[in-house]
Amino acid sequence: MSGHSKWSTIKRKKAKVDAQRGKIFTRLAREIIVAARQGGGDPESNVRLKAAIQRAKEANVPNENIMRAIQKGTGELGGANYEEIIYEGYGPGGAAVMIEIMTDNRNRTAGEIRHIFARNGGSLGETGCVAWMFEEKGLIVVEKKGSEPDEDSLMLLALEAGADDFKAEEDSYEITTAPGDLQKVRGALEGAGVKIALAEVAMIPQTTVKLEGDDAERMTRLVDALEEHDDVQNVYANYEIED
């Protein structure tokens, strides 16, 4: 992985999880359930729910699954009571790690996550130990291949729509926004015919640490193991591995 591009991480992960579509559906359903429980079942007045539904549709989750998840969140249907938790810790080489969890059994999940850290050369930390190294941002990714309009026009369009920053990566453009502006900027880009590869609220690292050798290999294994855990929704880390 070169740099700390979120999109390079997403692409690396995509091939691995494509064969686990059932797990993807489950994770997206949990996000919808929690979003509906916290902000109600109307996506027009619940920004988080609207974003979760969009991600589910992009992953080809059937509409009936989406509706059931909303109804579970609002209490119209019964189901597990999922709790949203953020875990923080350190990986090999001192890399900072944040994990978004949705679980119906906090104690079980905490033990399993702690074991994953220990097995891969890291340690689960206290709340707040690394959160200060990250900033919550809206993240929009546009792939360079076949991208319209050109880079300068896309940057101007994004910034005029309210984006905070625009960055050209090796094979993509990454646009960051305030979390509350994500849908507005996304709508402006899509309205101009821009094809969006990813749009989500993410924890963006403010600084990164370079890893190599054994530390790089162990960090990769740690992130993979965390992402494979059923209760993990997202993993964020501030490391980079040079190609």
Swiss-Prot record:
Transmembrane segments: none annotated. One of its GO terms (molecular function) is DNA binding. It holds the Pfam family Transcrip_reg. Keywords: Cytoplasm, DNA-binding, Transcription, Transcription regulation. Its main location: cytoplasm. It is found in: Cytoplasm. Belongs to the TACO1 family. HAMAP family: Transcrip_reg_TACO1 (MF_00693). This is Probable transcriptional regulatory protein PTH_1024.
